[in-house]
């Protein structure tokens, strides 16, 4: 993990409520913590002029969707993102999907779910219940985009909307 990512993650609040979508009122308490951590992460990114996603959930906090983007060669590549909260959350990290990239890279599972098994999942499991959605974005999706978008562009697999 690079120093910038480490410093950013250290500023994201750690969560304390160990609850998943089936845990009733405890889940509501967990969602409050999730939103507080996400708001802080967005503030950190905006302050660093590194705004790269927006996200929202359904009323129950079980289905999340939004947009993420990556700037490469002065062009903005924007993608839809989505994930469902696993029933076993927070023990199991959410599987973030970028459906439009499904099948375009080997670092992705069926349905456009990004591959996070080698580096991210062990880190997540060591930090249950303290890591949440903001941490999954910072430590999972952000590095994945940084590695994969340039590769996909340079190999002609994806094109910028202006180049189509």
Curated annotation (Swiss-Prot):
Active site: 115
Keyword Metal-binding among record annotations: no
GO biological process: protein ufmylation; response to endoplasmic reticulum stress; reticulophagy
Record-linked InterPro entries: UBQ-conjugating_enzyme/RWD (IPR016135), Ufc1 (IPR014806)
SUPFAM superfamilies, per the entry: UBC-like (SSF54495)
GO molecular function: UFM1 conjugating enzyme activity; UFM1 transferase activity
Record flagged with keyword Ligase: no
Entry keywords, A to Z: Ubl conjugation pathway
Domain of life of the native organism: Eukaryota
Family that this chain belongs to: Belongs to the ubiquitin-conjugating enzyme family. UFC1 subfamily.
Cited function: E2-like enzyme which forms an intermediate with ufm1 via a thioester linkage.
Protein name: Ubiquitin-fold modifier-conjugating enzyme 1
Gene behind this protein: ufc1
